[in-house]
Regions:
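Conserved "HGTGT" condensation-loop signature of ketosynthase/thiolase-family condensing enzymes
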Residues: 1-122, 126-169
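Gly/Ser-rich catalytic serine loop of serine hydrolases
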Residues: 116, 175-176
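Short catalytic-loop micro-motif centered on adjacent basic/acidic residues
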Residues: 170-174
């Protein structure tokens, strides 16, 4: 960055983390996650999200008892893959934790100063699998138009930014 640009935006090298949220196999909030972590609880157990009886491995660390309607309308939740629902729920908790619940009332000039940074192990593969099953069993007219976009790991950051009208950087870190 040039000296001239640095002078115009001197805060570009600093970040302030003001809130946090978590949806994990050991807790569906940052507080329950931390309590479980400190207590040494494991999130691993039998797979319940799908029939794993034909698989060699039947144990995973699944998120349990997650209800997306606690943080979004059912109509919105149906259009999202499960990992995006997790991202929106965790971001909602982070925004509330930071005391930014009035984010919708912010002036547009302030919304570009808020970055949305999401970390994920991958995209919504279950949406693509359901789309492939629908295509094979009933034909292309029954494939959701949301199936392919749901595969993108960046959908978490995109949907959080769209829900809250944030126009700052939307960044996705994807790592297995």
């Amino acid at each position: 960055m040039s000296a001239e640009n640095r002078a115009l935006r001197p805060d570009t090298s600093r970040a302030v983390i003001t809130g946090y949220g978590a949806i994990t196999p050991i807790g569906n909030s940052a507080a329950t996650y931390w309590e479980s972590l400190v207590a040494g609880r494991s999130g691993a157990g039998p797979i319940t999200h799908f029939d794993a009886s034909a698989n060699e491995v039947r144990i995973a660390a699944e998120v349990k008892d997650f209800d997306p309607t606690h943080t979004m309308e059912m109509k919105m939740a149906r259009r999202m893959s499960r990992f995006v629902q997790f991202a929106v729920a965790a971001a909602t908790e982070a925004i509330e934790h930071a005391g930014l619940a009035t984010i919708h009332e912010w002036e547009a000039e302030h919304r570009d100063r808020v970055a949305t940074i999401i970390n994920t192990g991958g995209g919504g593969i279950e949406q693509v699998t359901m789309g492939a099953d629908a295509f094979r069993e009933r034909g292309g007219r029954f494939v959701s138009p949301f199936a392919i976009p749901a595969l993108s790991p960046s959908m978490g950051a995109c949907m959080v930014s769209m829900k809250y009208g944030l126009t700052g950087p939307a960044i996705t870190q994807a790592a297995a």
